[in-house]
From Swiss-Prot:
PROSITE patterns: RADICAL_SAM (PS51918). Interacts with PqqD. The interaction is necessary for activity of PqqE. [4Fe-4S] cluster binds at C18, C22, C25. This is PqqA peptide cyclase. Pathway: Cofactor biosynthesis; pyrroloquinoline quinone biosynthesis. It comes from Xanthomonas oryzae pv. oryzae (strain KACC10331 / KXO85).
Length: 372
């Protein structure tokens, strides 16, 4: 039995249910049904185990976490355990009554997704009518209650030109921080890659827009920026290194090293109903396999950045090369690197196909706001 340093944070994917249908969603293609979701007692136990391990942060996500009626109870439990609580939400479900309950429970931060600053573009991406006005009202409610607000803006070929507007929106909505992140091609994002891939020219324009805003705004707004891997020369340290800083809990209670880990066929993922979190973290097959550097191929073993990027993303290596145990093809040392760049350029230059919206296999009845 081994003991690894505890993760910094735990992501609780409470549900895969969501009013939105964003084509870049990082949720798996096989979405968990309501009947499969872990119950309140299971999530409370998870929080207790995380706190006992030394985890510092609990991020409540989904799907849409505000669809869980027990969310205030879970936030309150996290508070009692000394865990920092963060809500990651679409802002179109739950409304002010739920927000009041969450504030009373001790919620400490809200991250709100924004699909576009153009109302029609926002609705098209979200697959949901009137999404932007509802998000604006939710942001106002968050700030009226004194809660810190971060805007999460996901970029792709259809909205890359509107980065300045997204930053202006964050200021207007009194956010303290904005994360401007290009689509990461996992889950539904990978399925929709050809519909979402920006051109290199679009990428460079977003870099310039962020650099300009940082110079002009100084400390008045924190701006985080994430580039698309397909145009990079070096891989990013996925999740800060596999099994090192982050643990993801699926709605079913499966314990994952990252959002997309379930795409790796043949890997065994333990469930909280059957095994304790600390044991899974320290000794679970899924966490041990790619933790550290021993698993790395020879080309990575000799790289001075091996303990900086940790070989890149395992799920991306699988998706692009068919082998999760090889170096991330985004890396310029990979024999597949040129092919990755060529794929991005080819897809960005071609007409964008229609979105494949994030929908369960048996979608719930459409609401008046759902775009079909």
């Amino acid at each position: 039995m081994t003991t690894a340093p505890p993760p910094l944070s735990v992501l609780l994917e409470l549900t895969h249910r969501c009013p939105l249908a964003c084509p870049y969603c990082s949720n798996p293609i096989a979405l968990a049904a309501l009947r499969e979701e872990m119950d309140t007692a299971g999530w409370r136990s998870l929080l207790e185990q995380a706190a006992e391990m030394g985890v510092l942060q609990a991020h409540f996500s989904g799907g849409e976490p505000m669809l869980r009626k027990d969310l205030p109870e879970l936030v309150a439990h996290a508070r009692t355990l000394g865990l920092y609580s963060n809500l990651i939400t679409s802002g179109v479900a739950g409304g002010e009554p739920m927000l009041d309950q969450l504030q009373a429970a001790g919620l400490e931060h809200v991250q709100l997704s924004v699909q576009d600053v153009d109302p029609a573009g926002a609705d098209r991406i979200a697959g949901y009518r009137n999404s932007l006005p509802k998000k604006r009202d939710f942001a106002a409610a968050v700030r009226a209650r004194g809660l810190p607000l971060t805007i999460n803006a996901v970029l792709h070929r259809h909205n890359a030109e509107r980065v300045p507007g997204m930053i202006a929106l964050a200021l207007e909505w009194q956010a303290e921080r904005i994360e401007v992140a290009h689509t990461q091609y996992y889950g539904w994002g990978l399925r929709n890659r050809a519909a979402l891939m920006p051109s290199r020219e679009q990428l460079m324009a977003t870099i310039d827009a962020v650099d300009t805003a940082r110079r002009e705004l100084g400390d008045s707004l924190a701006i985080d920026f994430v580039t698309p891997d397909y145009y990079a020369r070096q891989p990013k340290p996925c999740m800060g290194g596999w099994g090192q800083r982050f643990v993801n809990i699926s709605p079913r209670g499966d314990v994952l090293p990252c959002h997309a880990a379930e795409t790796i066929e043949g890997m065994r993922f333990d469930n909280l109903r059957e095994r304790a979190l600390a044991d899974i973290w320290n000794n679970g097959e899924a966490f041990v396999r790619f933790r550290g550097t021993a698993w790395m191929p020879e080309v990575c073993q000799g790289c001075p950045k091996r303990e900086i990027d940790w070989g890149g993303c395992r799920c991306q290596a699988l998706a692009l090369s068919g082998n999760a145990a090889t170096l991330d093809p985004v890396c310029e040392r990979s024999p597949a690197h040129a092919q990755v760049r060529a794929t991005a350029e080819r897809e960005a230059a071609a007409p964008a196909p229609e979105f494949i919206y994030r929908r369960p296999e048996r979608p719930a009845p459409a609401t008046a706001d759902t775009l079909e």
